[in-house]
Amino acid sequence: MDPNTVSSFQDILMRMSKMQLGSSSEDLNGMITQFESLKLYRDSLGEAVMRMGDLHSLQNRNGKWREQLGQKFEEIRWLIEEVRHRLKITENSFEQITFMQALQLLFEVEQEIRTFSFQLI
């Protein structure tokens, strides 16, 4: 796990939590929750890769491992689309920078999860 990615997650989450988007604050809270969930999932996959023998225990604990992986990719795609949409509609430069960084982070995390999952398959 790249320490820069960890600090990026923390930075993005902190920035998003400070945003006031009016009526869409519920949506923003949902995005923050999904970012946190995605970070935890990515971290757990990374730990499983570090302990390569964990593939079998991971599969035994969670018989629907591949299905869960597919759901995470769906969440990433949804978050990417949501962040792109927010980026298009916001005029606040702080929010634009935050959403651009969030988008870059999502692309990096998607690639990391793909790499981890290929190593585990």
Curated annotation (Swiss-Prot):
Where does this one sit in the cell? Answer: Virion; Host nucleus
Primary location: virion
Q: Name one GO cellular component term.
A: host cell nucleus
Where the record places motif Nuclear export signal is 12-21, 85-94
Keywords associated with the record: Host nucleus, Host-virus interaction, Transport, Virion
For this protein, the record's InterPro entries field holds:
Flu_NS2 (IPR000968)
Q: State whether keyword Kinase applies.
A: no
User: Member of which family?
Assistant: Belongs to the influenza viruses NEP family.
Q: Which HAMAP family match?
A: INFV_NEP
- This one is known as Nuclear export protein
Origin organism lineage: Viruses, Riboviria, Orthornavirae, Negarnaviricota, Polyploviricotina
Gene that produces this protein = NS
